């Protein structure tokens, strides 16, 4: 029994760790949708520039290389901006999680106090019952109904 690891409320299991690689990629793409779009557009610009170089069309190749630089810059701006926005959302989410944890702790404390009060009431009832039983026993002894000594 001692070797069994029981879950703890202090263990903060990150659901991101349990995801597969494709799920992680999809999760990140949903977080910052402009970054994959920018990467795809940059790849298209590089492919078209490579096509221009292969065919010898220097003007077209140069145009697509310029587009590539611009699209990479926009992708970088989208990445930094998305990270900033996501960080702000995480801060507010963290505050919300802390509030929920505080409420949960307060609820547990209230339940614990109720349990202690219930146990206290039960102890008082048991003491009162024992006191009444002792009083009844004393009353029976004084009237002679109950004899503690065995017959000789």
From Swiss-Prot:
Q: Got a GO cellular component term for this one?
A: respiratory chain complex
* Domain called HIG1: residue spans: 6-97
Q: Where in the cell is it found?
A: Mitochondrion membrane
Q: Which UniProt keywords apply?
A: Coiled coil, Membrane, Mitochondrion, Transmembrane, Transmembrane helix
User: Does Transmembrane helix show up as a keyword for this record?
Assistant: yes
Question: Where are its TM segments located?
Answer: 34-50, 64-86
* InterPro entries noted in UniProt: Hypoxia_induced_domain, RCF1
Q: Give the record's GO biological process terms.
A: mitochondrial cytochrome c oxidase assembly; mitochondrial respirasome assembly; regulation of proton transport
Q: Which residues form a coiled coil?
A: 113-143
**How does the protein's chain sit in the membrane according to the entry?**
Multi-pass membrane protein
UniProt key word Coiled coil: yes
Q: List the disulfide bonds.
A: none
What family is reported? Belongs to the RCF1 family.
According to its UniProt entry, what is the function of this protein?
A: Cytochrome c oxidase subunit which plays a role in assembly of respiratory supercomplexes.
UniProt subunit comment = Associates with the respiratory chain complex III/complex IV supercomplex.
Name this protein carries in UniProt: Respiratory supercomplex factor 1, mitochondrial
Q: Could you tell me the gene encoding this protein?
A: RCF1
